Amino acid sequence: GTYGYPTPAVKKIESYYDVPEGVDIRGRYDAEFAKILTKDALKFVADLQREFRNHIKYALECRREAKKKYNEGALPEFDPATTYIREQEWVCAPVPPAVADRKVEITGPVDRKMVINALNSGAKVFMADFEDALSPGWENLMRGQVNLKDAVAGTISLHDKARNRVYKLNDQTAKLFVRPRGWHLPEAHILIDGEPATGCLVDFGLYFYHSYSAFRRTQGAGFGPFFYLPKMEHSREAKIWNNVFEKAEKVAGIERGSIRATVLIETLPAVFQMNEILYELKDHSVGLNCGRWDYIFSYVKTFQAHPDRLLPDRVLVGMTQHFMKSYSDLLIRTCHRRGVHAMGGMAAQIPIKEDPVANEVALELVRKDKLREVKAGHDGTWAAHPGLIPACMEIFNNNMGNASNQIDTVKREDGANITEQDLLQIPRGARTMEGLRLNTRVGIQYVAAWLTGSGSVPLYNLMEDAATAEISRVQNWQWLKYGVELNGDGLGVKVNKELFGRVVEEEMARIEKEVGTEKFKEGMYKEACKIFTRQCTSPMLDDFLTLDAYNYIVVHHPRETSKL
């Protein structure tokens, strides 16, 4: 089969998905899923795929070209060809009233209980995630679609028998944004004209098709649906999204500019394209967001062939590092100049119930970080756990008066002087054995959870998603490739394969001790260790860990589940 996935044997069975011409479903049949995978909804997805697949292939080809240039020594830069877009005065369409106030946004995967709790959390926005917080197996994706459809309809509920509790929506809920996958991820359970569908078009298309009408009536107050767009590297990728939105609006018969999206600036090339990205999405934009971990991951990836740009321990690469501060300042200036939200980054801390002292220390860190954001001019921020919402909300409320946002009040004209050198400045700090160990034990545990269906994983009192595993593996890769000296702990040890092998062995023993032998045997820790270690030691750096690990979770049903 395509991409070396097994080609299923054709056997007729009683229940199958009713599919349009050219669409073939290889995921398990389920009557609930069939309400999502209707013939019309699949036709909508297939039409998007057919119209845009060549543009998507071209955009991904351009990513490879850019990578080649960086590997030959080039640095990312502002594009001279689009100077006029950066210099002219223009603004995006006005912000829809329903989402003027986004002071605190909670993020999380699309499982049923999470969706209910997040919508009820008291945050202004819930970003329901099909991307880094979700392991994209068939069941997770399709259940997620069912959950969002029910959430928008207002009917979502859950009876937790173990706790004897019924979960349902409050009268007041957060506004729903949905984050589809990035352009590079395939959906191997749905074939269109014999090729795997583009993951994000499946995520976007199925959700939009079933929910746009109810969403605009309720949540969006005449606008919407709302989206978050991940991992873009260039404005040409934003242009494809803009065209997808316009096509969807046309098919649905809703006004142009109804659909709105916030773009995550979480790759190094994209920071030089912020004006251009907003310009492409002018009628469909509701701002940009700082995706910190992925941005650092992208810094390492972009400079994989530049030994002069080694990172210190990742815990030291905070927002106060010059290149990170420059990135967030430029993002705020750009968004406010163009009339849209500049969203702050993630607070990943999880409340530590069993240790009030440690909990207070963690909360203090969150408060400090959020205070920095609101003072810099951010309009809102992210939290991974509902327990952080009150602290974040308080900081933003106290520092913004009664305003919904700071778009008109904090212009950050000083951001006009931020240069390419500022954005690329090499971060300072030491490299330590503990840095290498932490990357290894967190990376392996994250991949193990991902392989067993969890994409959002609590580890050492932080809520981790795929971005953490990515930065962990590329940093290990970089240190190994260049044999860096661990200068931070006075031992002067150089990182090499032998040392890394020993670290992996010791960290695996530590993980087993921490999770218990039983769980260690049941979990996919050995497989995860193989994948993670291979990624850290391979001669060439893989673009995405999730792309490599995806092959392990694709399950093609041997029975044919859609009629030919």
UniProtKB/Swiss-Prot annotation:
Catalytic activity, as annotated: glyoxylate + acetyl-CoA + H2O = (S)-malate + CoA + H(+)
Residues annotated as catalytic: R179, D465
Residue span of motif Microbody targeting signal: 562-564
A biological-process GO annotation: glyoxylate cycle
GO MF annotation list: malate synthase activity
Protein family: Belongs to the malate synthase family.
UniProt protein name: Malate synthase, glyoxysomal
Organism field: Glycine max (Soybean)
